[in-house]
Amino acid sequence: MNYELVFLAAGQGKRMNAQKNKMWLELVGEPIFIHALRPFLADNRCSKVIVVSQEEERKHVKELMSQLNVAESRIEIVKGGSERQYSVAAGLERCGTERVVLVHDGARPFITLDIIDRLLIGVEQSKAAICAVKVKDTVKRVVKGVVQETVDRENLWQVQTPQAFELPILRKAHQLARKEQFLGTDEASLVERLPCPVAIVQGSYYNIKLTTPEDMPLAKAILGELGGIAND
């Protein structure tokens, strides 16, 4: 099954305490951007990549693409919005070649082809599929610094990206969210409101999102453990 990819690279890096977009921070000699994008470029089923970036960084994205010898016909760069959701919507406007679209956060550099495989099976069966891992830690609900309850973690999952959807469903979900002025934290939260069942497939505990400075040493350790190749 072929798919198009909306690749989000318009982050600000504020929580990373970086002076630039965290996508351009180096991880073992290469930008996080390249680590996160390479598995999709290596997947022949990925027919098109829509990179959503800040307007002032388009030139830098193009330079990186040329270094990776990616055909221009396979890449399109679009301007991101003020919120993640608006950036995804901008990317979706440029989709339409394939029935299925994947959305991925560029700050997750350890995606694997195995996860992509599971997502494509999931979206074929359920029209919407996300990857996730079971919560390991004890979870508390806290109000004003005081524990209110211990949450049963049996049915709790930590959601990751990529997330996979049939394109018409994700577009419809974005249209509804815009109409109702709903702002979600991921695509699945929009699709759930249609309503539409969203299937879960197994992600990876290695598939972390690089958000704060503490994540960088962990990322280097993961890359070392994987031998530079993100396999489950």
UniProtKB/Swiss-Prot annotation:
GO terms for molecular function: 2-C-methyl-D-erythritol 4-phosphate cytidylyltransferase activity. Pfam families: IspD. The record marks R153, K209 as: Positions MEP for the nucleophilic attack. One of its GO terms (biological process) is isopentenyl diphosphate biosynthetic process, methylerythritol 4-phosphate pathway. Coiled coil: none annotated. The keyword Transferase applies. The keyword Metal-binding does not apply. This is 2-C-methyl-D-erythritol 4-phosphate cytidylyltransferase. It comes from Listeria monocytogenes serotype 4b (strain F2365).
